[in-house]
Amino acid sequence: MPSVLIPLCVYLQQRKGQATGLAFIDATSLAVCHNRRIYSHKVFKKIAKRGKTSMGWFYGFKLHLIINERGELLAFRLTPGNVDDRRPVPELTRGLTGKLFGDKGYLSKRLFQTLFEEGLQLITPIRKNMHNRLLPLFDKLLLRKRALIETVNDQLKNISQIEHTRHRSVANFMVNLVAGLIAYTHQPLKPSLNLTNPQQALLNEPL
């Protein structure tokens, strides 16, 4: 493992944003080789796994992210590609309170209850076969803003270049990933929501 990786990880922790009571969660795939080369791929043979997203199958890892409404990174976790998006959530959200918005992949009564007991309300869309529920208008509006974190993931891949298939070692992959996340934290103009003071005050209301 390159000696630079540990200092980079420490620095990345220092670059995390401030919890504001509003957060968005998502997971994005990090493919390490083309699907046709899975069986001949050796670098990540023992740790990468096949996973599936809305775009199809991939071989590699998942990067799980939580951001605030300013586009700042609050938490991150790397897992093999076959890990359920919900599994890392309790650890990722440790210390966070307020509202957490995610897609349908985070639907889970057990997860909702676990987070609610910690002071964090998980808000997701519902499936077509589920009974409709009443949400405050502000929460419905924020639920439609989940694209914010998708934009962050897009910038991480296309600007910070955290995903490519030319890695020669696991250590090189990790350094590239951490350095890319750090580079993103230094972007002066991050994707963000422009909330008014009254809207911000709604986030501070008790659950």
Task: Locate the predicted segments by residue.
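Short alpha-helical elements
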Residues: 1-207
